[in-house]
Amino acid sequence: MCLQILEQETKKHELWIEELEKKQQLAEKKPELRKEYEKSYKKYQNLLKKQDHLMRVGVYLLLNLAEDSKVEIKMKNKNIIELLVKMMKRQNMELLILVVSFLKKLSIFKENKDQMKEMEVMEKAAQLIPSQNDDLLNIALRLILNLTFDTEMRDKAVKSGLIPKLVDLISLEHHSVVVTCILYHISMDDKYRSYFSYTDCIPLVRYFKVLFFVSWIFSNHFH
């Protein structure tokens, strides 16, 4: 039931956006319709706040229910990943944190990761880096870390411009370990090591040589 409500709300939001864009285009052609568009936009903003709250509660409930692996599999079969990916476009921080947390939880399984690959989750996660919200930044980095266990996902990470973004974050103590692990993953591919020469990351690349403990960190802290 909760999943169905979220699906309905997602479709409803898509219709709101479509209608709003039409009114905006008309207002651009006919200035006399500008006030009507502004009125519709304010109405949309109010509806959006209410919908964000409803979705936040829904995702929170599903995330907790997914602690049961059997329930999680049922959600997967009902396209929970596709629904969550659509919600990555939302602007509400609390909702985004829950959505990315859910994706991070699901991303430890290869079949889920493959689906996320098709839905460009890496590209969408890269857009969240950096974030002024520290909790969102933290969970987005952990999602990216899980995804970069896959070679193709590492390609997507580089093509999304993540390397310089990650290098800028490495000085933040509370994110440095996760960031270092992601960069370590990327550096395992010879073709991408040269990318680090265009950053302030040369000492870090050298440091990777002594990061043999990193596999232990992965298995004990990030899955």
PLM segments and residue spans:
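Long amphipathic alpha-helical tracts in eukaryotic proteins
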Residues: M1-H223
